[in-house]
Each structure stands twice: as structure tokens, then as C-alpha cells.
From Swiss-Prot:
It holds the Pfam family ADK. CDD domains: ADK (cd01428). Consists of three domains, a large central CORE domain and two small peripheral domains, NMPbind and LID, which undergo movements during catalysis. The LID domain closes over the site of phosphoryl transfer upon ATP binding. Assembling and dissambling the active center during each catalytic cycle provides an effective means to prevent ATP hydrolysis. It is an enzyme of class 2 (transferase). PROSITE patterns: ADENYLATE_KINASE. GO terms for molecular function: adenylate kinase activity; ATP binding. Residues 30-59 are annotated as: NMP. This is Adenylate kinase. ATP binds at residues 10-15, 128, 137-138, 195. PANTHER family: NUCLEOTIDE KINASE. Monomer. The gene is adk.
């Protein structure tokens, strides 16, 4: 089974990816893991990627696409299939993936799209607060401290609502054309992500069982 998993930051994509891998025994291919493995193994694309990272530069698409192709060419993929997580991030990468899969003779069988209302994600992602003295982490809504005094806590820049909203807006703008691209191919399975983790996986499991 050859799959993509998509969803906005905070939608629970990582949790569900781990459950899919455990239940269906597919190879979990995440962008971070791919880059690390390619650099450690000093593959052609890994060496190239490291040269950009060492200079503090963004890795160009052609290198990222090359690393994906290297990984999808490995023998375990033929045996287990894959779950691609964190790629493609842009419509250009989606087109590159189409080309790579065609060249390797691999058919993409499904795209799991975990849908959560962006407002819910904003609340979920921007609620983290940290105690100034102890460094303990809490959440304003889901795990509030017992004796909350605003002056005793701070937020990391990444967790501030305006930063989170910008990140979500970028992800929505990049993700919508990708979803539309795969929806036109009849590959997208929308999953309601605003429910219990186990219920989300139950819905995914039903979809994937029908794909087998």
C-alpha cells in the first residue's frame, strides 16, 4: 500500500502516521528522517543537501525531490509499500512526485487528509505557556496550571497566536492546491480530525482496509 498523509500543523498527523505504520506495516517515510539518513549514508543527494544546510541555506526542491527518489528506490519499499509524511509540501513537489513514481513504476493508492478547523488548531497550538522559574510546560485551555498568574508564565515566540496563525495560513495556501491535485485523481480520503485520537484512527483504518 502506497500512501500520503496530509494535515495542518497540530492536526495529529504524526500520531496517526505512527498508528498506520504499526497496523499496516508500511515504511514510514518522513522528510526529516529521509534527510538525516541520506546525509549519514552520504548518498549523492545527501552530500548535496548537507552542503546547503551547512551554509544555512534552504535545500532546493530538486535536491529534496532527489532524496525522495533515492528513498523510494530502495528495496524495502517494493515489499512493504510506504506512508509519505511531510512531502510534498508544494504543488511543484507534488508534480515532481508524480514523475518519480511513474519512473519507478509505483502507483500511489491513497491520500489521507486529516481535516481540523484552523480556529481549533490556533487554540490548540497557541495555548502553550512555560513557567518562568520551573520551566514546566502547561496549556491555557487543555492543561492549565492550578494557580495561574500571567506574570509567572511566558510564551515562546513560535507559540504566540500571531506566529501560529501565519504558519497555518502558509500551510493552508501551500496545501490546498496539493489536495485539489490529488482529489482530481480520486485519491483523497478526508478524515475528521476533530475527534478522539482512536476515533480518528478508526476512520482511517476503515479507509485503508477497503484499499487493501
Amino acid at each position: 500500500m502506497n500512501l500520503l498523509i496530509m494535515g495542518l500543523p497540530g492536526a495529529g498527523k504524526g500520531t496517526q502516521a505512527a498508528k498506520i505504520v504499526e497496523q499496516f506495516h508500511v515504511a514510514h517515510i518522513s522528510t526529516g528522517d529521509m534527510f538525516r539518513a541520506a546525509m549519514v549514508n552520504q548518498t549523492e543527494m545527501g552530500v548535496l543537501a548537507k552542503s546547503y544546510i551547512d551554509k544555512g541555506e534552504l535545500v532546493p526542491d530538486e535536491v529534496t525531490n532527489g532524496i525522495v527518489k533515492e528513498r523510494l528506490s530502495q528495496d524495502d519499499i517494493k515489499e512493504t509499500g510506504f506512508l509519505l509524511d511531510g512531502y510534498p509540501r508544494t504543488i511543484e513537489q507534488a508534480h515532481a512526485l508524480d514523475k518519480t513514481l511513474a519512473e519507478l513504476g509505483i502507483e500511489l493508492e491513497g491520500v489521507i487528509n486529516i481535516e481540523v478547523n484552523p480556529d481549533s488548531l490556533l487554540e490548540r497550538l497557541s495555548g502553550r505557556i512555560i513557567h518562568r522559574v520551573t520551566g514546566e510546560t502547561f496549556h491555557k485551555v487543555f492543561n492549565p496550571p492550578v494557580d495561574y498568574k500571567e506574570e509567572d508564565y511566558y510564551q515562546r515566540e513560535d507559540d504566540k497566536p500571531e506566529t501560529v496563525k501565519r504558519r497555518l495560513d502558509v500551510n493552508i495556501a501551500q496545501g490546498e492546491p496539493i489536495i485539489a491535485h490529488y482529489r482530481a485523481k480520486g485519491l483523497v480520503h478526508d478524515i475528521e480530525g476533530n475527534q478522539d485520537i482512536n476515533d480518528v484512527f478508526s476512520d482511517i483504518e476503515k479507509v485503508l482496509t477497503n484499499l487493501k
